[in-house]
Amino acid sequence: MKNIKTTVFGMGCFWGAEEVFRKINGVVSTEVGFMGGTIKNPTYGQVCRGKSGHIEVVKIDYDPEIISYDELLDLFWNNHNPTTPNKQGWDVGEQYSSYIFYFDDEQKLIAEKSLEKMQENTDLKIVTIIEKAGSFYPAEEYHQKYFMKKNNSILNF
């Protein structure tokens, strides 16, 4: 069996975040959902109303022999604005915050170095939070692979 690893990113609306990663060679699967927060199994409505403290995230299972964690981080940084707190584009709210959730010390170290490198290249403050992964709560089915199902060309990734 292959050595599949997992990472979770919060980078605004999870529909677009999933679309960034789902077609990448080496990504085995993606799933959108919620992390952080104060209640178990939150609904999309609870998260959007700001009542749960959760972040919209994309969970990515990947084969590190095909794509590295560094490469996934590059996609993360290049597909959202890590300098705007609680906001991505038109989407405003705590649930749209920039987060990297790590699963082990190696991911933590790589993520921290990656953030330092990003900060060196901008005068703006990077507000991305790096945090140990906790419980992942999948979003409702209609949110999964949203743009693929809708065949929506609004996003040009």
Curated annotation (Swiss-Prot):
Disulfide cross-links: none
Keywords in alphabetical order: Oxidoreductase
InterPro entries cross-referenced by the UniProt entry: Met_Sox_Rdtase_MsrA_dom (IPR002569), Met_Sox_Rdtase_MsrA_sf (IPR036509)
E.C. no: 1.8.4.11
Enzyme class: oxidoreductase
One GO MF term: peptide-methionine (S)-S-oxide reductase activity
Active-site residues per Swiss-Prot or TrEMBL entry: C13
Role according to the record: Has an important function as a repair enzyme for proteins that have been inactivated by oxidation. Catalyzes the reversible oxidation-reduction of methionine sulfoxide in proteins to methionine.
Protein name: Peptide methionine sulfoxide reductase MsrA
Organism: Methanococcus maripaludis (strain DSM 14266 / JCM 13030 / NBRC 101832 / S2 / LL)
